[in-house]
Amino acid sequence: MSIAKALVMSDLHLEHGNKITIPVIDGVKFLILAGDIGSNQSHLEFIKDCASKYTVIYILGNHEFYGFTLKEVRDFWKSVKIDNFYFLDNSSVVIDDIEFIGSTLWVDFDRQNPRIMLNASLVITDFRKIYNATADEYITVDSIYREFEISYNYLKEAIYNDNGFKKVMITHYGFSHESVHPSYRDREADLTNNHCYTSNLDYFVGNSLVNVAIHGHMHTSADYMLGDVRVVCEPVGYPDTLNPEFHFKVVDLK
């Protein structure tokens, strides 16, 4: 039986001027883009080029929403019709007996810890860049926690559904603090900020029916196991702070 393979990456941040050419790799069918590729629709031509080379699975990061409402960005990408392109937003698609399950996920702020939520509201740029329902109202920590709940409840149904397919879960936000780079695990400020980037869902993911779980957002590479689930994060990063470990990583999905 052939092994399905995917080129996995996130956080290309094309809106900041990164120039990335996606190579064609023999034997690789899928390209998984785990969010923060660009801002709203600015990277549409990049997506079209990717879809000419691979079957593309794409989810939104937080940066795609900058300058727009949540609904505007979601509606745009739902409207995009490109061959070999699949946009997932609390949704899934089955290709070659693999169920790709996608969600931005967002974050639970250490289970709604008031101290973490206050810190996030002060230091996280999203709350001054992303609009909620209208252009007169920014998102808040409370509204993003509600987004997290919606995503979590969707994923709970999807990743525990024994429907016979191999499962690949793709989120933008992290779901385990194991993805936090060791250099960000000691200082108190880092420990506080980490809860703004990833939730602690180790048991939830590690005991699921997922084969591979992919995320972005952290800007440092990770590849480890949660139970029987392989976790992969392969971000590019900002132009002035590129991830030195980034490479064109190919992952076996089955």
How would you label these PLM feature ranges?
Residues 56-64, 69-132:
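A basic- and aromatic-enriched beta-loop-alpha substructure that forms the phosphate/nucleotide-
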Residues 2-3, 94, 181-187, 192-210, ...:
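Binuclear metal-dependent phosphoesterase catalytic core
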Residues 1-59, 64-73, 134-137, 254:
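N-terminal active-site segment of His-dependent metallophosphoesterases
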Residues 13-20, 38-44, 63-70, 92-94, ...:
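Active-site environment of divalent metal-dependent phosphoester hydrolases
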Residues 3-13, 97-105, 168-172, 230-236:
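Active-site-proximal beta-strand elements of phosphoester/diester hydrolases
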